[in-house]
Curated annotation (Swiss-Prot):
Residues 109-311 form the ATP-grasp domain. The lineage of its organism: Bacteria, Bacillati, Cyanobacteriota, Cyanophyceae, Synechococcales. PROSITE patterns: ATP_GRASP (PS50975), GARS (PS00184). The keyword Ribosomal protein does not apply. Keywords: ATP-binding, Ligase, Magnesium, Manganese, Metal-binding, Nucleotide-binding, Purine biosynthesis. This is Phosphoribosylamine--glycine ligase. Pfam families: GARS_A (PF01071), GARS_C (PF02843), GARS_N (PF02844). Mg(2+) binds at E281, N283. Pathway: Purine metabolism; IMP biosynthesis via de novo pathway; N(1)-(5-phospho-D-ribosyl)glycinamide from 5-phospho-alpha-D-ribose 1-diphosphate: step 2/2.
Amino acid sequence: MKVAVIGSGGREHTLAWSLVRSPEVSHCYCLPGNGGTAGLPKTENVAIAVDQLGEICEFCQTEKINLVVVGPELPLTLGLTDQLQALGIKVFGPTKAGAELEASKSWTKQLLIEAGVPTAFGETFTEPAPAQAYATKMGAPIVVKADGLAAGKGVIVAQTSAEATTAIAELFDQGFEKIVVEEFLPGEEVSVLALCDGKTVIPLLPAQDHKRIGEGDQGLNTGGMGAYCPAPIAPPAVIDQVQKQILQPTANALAKRGIDYRGVLYAGLMVSPTGEIKVLEYNCRFGDPETQAVLPLLATPLEKVLMACVEQNLEQLGPLQWHSGNAVCVVVAAGGYPGSYRKGDEINGLAEAEAQDVKVFHAGTELKEGKVLTNGGRVLGVTALGKDLSTAIATAYRGVEQIDFDGMYYRRDIGHKAL
């Protein structure tokens, strides 16, 4: 079968890498792909951007693509799935209506309340003054969220009322029409990515992401500086609870609204010190860098799983098979990220890193005249497997140490809180 992966990040390199390992997949096109997908067997980069919906549809029709896998949220919220489906092309990823789950925090909050899914208490506002008054009344710490896509950076945990007031003003100044102000939930975060075919929901192994740029979870929020899987905070009994109380009720609520949701339900959850689980947010696609830690542990062929979602027969698939052990992904970023950063620096040591028994997934890279150059804030994700978490961590960092480019930065504490 011929597949197309839409996107250019570490998540998309991981998806393409997982897909082409199967003998069932004859060819994989990455639109537009990156420096890593350029070197994968059976894989070809195609210079079409993720928001060029017409060109994507035309390409998939011409090439007779059997399955399109959409990586990022943007094309989903623009309605790429709807357009491909109208042409009779099979696509993994929700329709525009389903992508509201990530595109609108207020819409999702309403859906969760209606479905009786536990989530943080909060209110939605369309003007700064009432939002600021509400935040002051609630007291700090308090959470301020942009109602719209903000590339994973639209959530501010304000430690003081003054900080909340500033954050609210800034989000409205940035052009967001609505914001959500909600209670701060203490505890430990976990990401549960689940597959949904519109009826059945199957959770993947739980992962934990590291959002802050600095060690010890200090500094600015990023798209994610590393992840490990499975996360011990969510053992199988907890995942069963998540399935029954959160994932399945969400899928049912979507179906009740007439939304045929076939794709990833990514639940960002908070596990309180007493073991209570609440939804912080939903995303409508694979997480990045969680995907780089979760998919290498999946033993069931990925294309089989995704096709079962698209063809609405997840129930017939049976339980997913997993490799034993743990996976860790350490993200290597460009100096200055998440602020302004340089591009175009040559990356050395990639082959030496992979000789350390790691897999290097490319994110912000491009291949130019045979050289791999930096081309984004998060540049690489170095993934290692191990019989236990400490082995996987040690192997991942051995790999990272082989890599070198100007201004390279990475956190040295990925996975440590689970040791």
